[in-house]
Each structure stands twice: as structure tokens, then as C-alpha cells.
């Protein structure tokens, strides 16, 4: 690592442990990370807090990560406050059960493409985008939330958010949706048909 830049390279494969939680957490001076083709995440099951508090990180491309066996992505990027560019286009999230706090306080993230995400196994989404105060629009129309038990504070204080598509969201009677839109004062374009979630929007 030099001047806050980290390049991961090796002659052979680098395979982290199945539990890769907190792998690079608190690398507060890290500005960029480049993962070479040698970084093999095929056997990883837990990415909880993997980049937690990488507070100086500005861009991150994880499009080559194999996440097909990952079940926990909670807090994966929380407190990455300087992050402006994040590429997760190759992510397979089909068996992920927890996305809670995943982008918590990513305050400078302006764009986020999660169109390839499969949320059908997810049970926890609370605080997922909490404090993403620079996001202006977000399309989560592909999300199937039929198994989600907790959505509390999901978009809390997304204060620049004007457009949000959650047309695929469904909240059961027992799903926690408290304060899901609290602080979303600029949100005027909401695509949603679920009555329980719409009530939270009305009362935000």
C-alpha cells in the first residue's frame, strides 16, 4: 500500500477465509483498492463489515467478486463516508439473508446501481441506506421483499432523495417498517403499491 492506494496481486490465487467479515475494516487512510484477478471469493460466506469505516475510500470496483455463497452482507460498506463510486454489478445475492446497514452513512454516494440484486432470501434490510444523504434517485424495482422481516429506517435521512422505485416491495403484517422514510424530505416521486409502506411515506 502506498499513499492510500492498495493493489492486491499475486502469482497464484488469494482466497480469503469463508468468514471474511471485517477483512479491511478501519483502514481509514485507504483511498483506493484494486483487486486483481487473483482474489478469489468463491468460498466466502460472510462479508459482514468487510469495508467498515474505510472512511477515505473514494471508489471501489467489486464487479469481479464471486458472491454466490455469501449469506451475510450486513454493514459491508457502513461508514464509507467518502465513497462516491461503487460497482457491484457482478454480485450474486440470491442466498443473502442480511443486508442491514449495508450502505449505512455512505454520505457521498451519489449513484448506486443494484438492478442485478436478488433480494428474495433477505430477511433484514433495516438501516440499509441510512444516511445516504447524497443519493438523488434509487431504483429497487427488482427487489422481492416477501421474506423481509425488518425494513425499519431503511432510507432514514436520505435527504437528497427525490425519486425512489420500490414497486416490487411487499410488507407483511408483521414486517417492521417504522421510520422507513424519516428525513426523506425531498422524496416526491415514489413508486410503491404496498399500503403499509405508503402509510409510512404519508406520515414521514
Please describe what each predicted stretch is.
Residues 1-204:
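Negatively charged
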